[in-house]
């Protein structure tokens, strides 16, 4: 041991300067410990309820980076390099892991081998540094949740980046409500939240439905401007990864212009505690809008929903809310004012809790489709009772009816809801289906569908093109292919399906079915999907 403070013991097998040791003490005592335990979050200290107290061990070594955890029920600590002693965010994040580890061995949240809660360890460890005054406007990677809200909450794809619900829980309840997710015994953070709050499952579902509605303008008590400034507003599509903030509906049948009935997309319908935000356009002069909602209950899915309408100001900085709606069938009439943007928010809240484990196969997770019938309003894509005009530089393509540049060959199929933007192109017998967007790259063969976005645009980190060739099948639902690294492609007989995170510079896979985290070492998976492709039928 080379130094000791009120709450920490410092160790090193190297010569550490007194200045560096004093910096370590100052940071860990006055920033980390103070904000986690003495004020702000008021988390219960490790060993607070034990007769024997052990100071966390801080191991400093030049080859260490920044990590934390423990090695016994009464031993927690951190392993850090000298350069990390100035990193307040990193130290808070990692010491949060040490705290989580202690609770896992002392009656709190514990992850089974199936791993139902590994994601929240990282998400919570990004939530805690955001509470430090110096980081109140630092949102880190949390934009991911708002860019792909249809994925289940707790997805492995954004496991560091989905902590906004903890911020809202802190607002609505108190900081201890977040702490109790970890201090309550149980294997799943959501059931721990329910248990610690004394809620029924219906009340837990209410919380997530209410939270989703407030995410339209990030209507939180604490630092909402930080979220709004970093994310931009919900309608922004200036970057390819922001093109799925709003979920466009599809016509339920050919009579949509008269019956005004629409359905959520097969791939875009929300998973458990995921949500859709749908832009609605009130008819000119309308004083109210009516929504008839009909949820789709697939056998075994235990479908249930929370939904409502949200009207915002033109700056997307304040909102009015309808009452939260529940169940498979409900009708809502809501007052509207001229000039107010209007949104339908639908959250998947199954009536029987659905456990999802880390990296669970995409096709084994329920997606909760729903239908709506509208009065005095049209959804995005169908304004004023007709299909919306195509984006600049594109027109309706004769083969399929979607939007594409005029140079697109007639042999290319572009489905009615698909788009080829001017930065992308397709040729040969390529098929662009469903809600797919070709933003930056080429498709010379195969099929691109689902919610796939091909190529990155508008990015400060590089606008990477992505290419699809051969007979590849690409139907993805997460971030744009090409977002993470450059020079990537899908070729041959490759089948990319669902929540794909395609990783590795120059990656070009040519065979097998893959979903989830996909790199050069990924195992081939099954594309089987439990969700029915049958078009739902309206019910009165």
Describe each model-derived feature in a short phrase.
Residues 144-221:
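Active-site-proximal alpha-helical
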Residues 189-389:
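Beta/coil-rich, acidic/histidine-enriched accessory regions frequently appended to metallopeptidases
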Residues 412, 418, 424, 430, ...:
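Residues at the loop-to-beta-strand transition
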Residues 37-59, 107-118, 137-143, 176-184:
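Surface-exposed patches in mature extracellular/periplasmic domains of secreted proteins
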Residues 1-75, 79-95, 99-103, 288-292, ...:
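Zn2+-dependent metallopeptidase catalytic core
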Residues 73-141:
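Zinc-dependent metallopeptidase catalytic helix centered on the HExxH motif
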Residues 23, 27, 31, 86, ...:
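Extracytoplasmic/secreted proteins, especially bacterial periplasmic and envelope-associated proteins
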Residues 378-439:
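Extended, small-residue-rich solenoid/repeat segments and analogous flexible loops
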């Amino acid at each position: 041991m080379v130094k000791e403070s009120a709450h920490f013991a410092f160790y090193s097998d190297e010569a550490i300067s007194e200045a560096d040791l004093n910096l370590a003490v100052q940071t860990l005592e006055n920033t980390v410990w103070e904000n986690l335990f003495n004020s702000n979050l008021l988390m219960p200290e490790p060993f607070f309820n034990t007769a024997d107290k052990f100071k966390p061990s801080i191991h400093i070594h030049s080859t260490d980076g920044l990590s934390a955890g423990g090695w016994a029920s009464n031993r927690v600590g951190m392993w850090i390099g000298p350069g990390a002693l100035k990193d307040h965010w990193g130290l808070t994040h990692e010491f949060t892991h040490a705290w989580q580890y202690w609770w896992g061995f002392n009656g709190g949240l514990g992850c089974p081998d199936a791993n139902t809660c590994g994601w929240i360890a990282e998400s919570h460890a990004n939530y805690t540094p955001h509470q430090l005054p110096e980081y109140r406007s630092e949102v880190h990677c949390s934009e991911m949740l708002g860019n792909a809200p249809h994925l289940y909450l707790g997805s492995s794809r954004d496991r560091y980046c989905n902590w906004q619900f903890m911020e809202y829980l802190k607002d609505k309840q108190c900081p201890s409500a977040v702490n109790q997710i970890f201090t309550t015994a149980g294997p799943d953070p959501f059931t721990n939240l329910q248990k610690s709050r004394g809620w029924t499952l219906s009340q837990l579902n209410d919380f997530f439905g209410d939270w989703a509605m407030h995410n339209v303008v990030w209507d939180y008590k604490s630092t909402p401007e930080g979220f709004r400034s970093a994310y931009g507003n919900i309608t922004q599509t200036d970057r390819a990864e922001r093109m799925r903030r709003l979920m466009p509906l599809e016509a339920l049948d050919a009579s949509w212009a008269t019956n005004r009935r629409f359905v959520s997309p097969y791939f875009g319908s929300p998973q458990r505690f995921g949500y859709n935000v749908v832009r609605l356009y009130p008819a000119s002069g309308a004083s109210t809008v009516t929504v008839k909602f009909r949820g789709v209950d697939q056998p075994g899915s235990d479908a249930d929903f929370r939904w409502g309408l949200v009207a915002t100001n033109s700056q997307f900085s304040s909102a009015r809310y309808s009452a939260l709606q529940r169940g498979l069938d409900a009708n809502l009439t809501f007052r509207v004012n001229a000039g107010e943007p209007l949104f339908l928010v639908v959250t998947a809240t199954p009536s029987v809790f659905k456990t999802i484990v880390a990296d669970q196969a995409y096709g084994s997770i329920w997606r909760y489709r729903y239908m709506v019938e509208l009065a005095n309003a049209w959804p995005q894509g169908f304004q004023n009772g007709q299909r919306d005009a195509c984006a600049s530089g594109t027109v309706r393509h004769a083969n399929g009816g979607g939007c594409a540049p005029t140079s697109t060959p007639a042999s290319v199929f572009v489905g009615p809801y698909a788009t080829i933007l001017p930065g992308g192109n397709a040729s040969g017998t390529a098929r662009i289906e469903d809600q797919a967007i070709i933003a930056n790259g080429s498709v010379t063969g195969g099929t691109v569908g689902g919610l796939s976005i091909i190529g990155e645009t508008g990015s400060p980190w590089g606008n990477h093109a992505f290419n699809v060739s051969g007979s590849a099948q690409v139907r993805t639902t997460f971030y744009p292919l090409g977002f993470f690294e450059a020079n990537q492609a899908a070729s041959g007989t490759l089948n990319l399906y669902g929540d794909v995170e395609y990783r590795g510079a120059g990656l070009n896979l040519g065979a097998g079915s893959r979903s989830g985290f996909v790199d050069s070492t990924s195992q081939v998976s099954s594309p089987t999907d439990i969700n029915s492709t049958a078009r739902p039928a309206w019910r009165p």
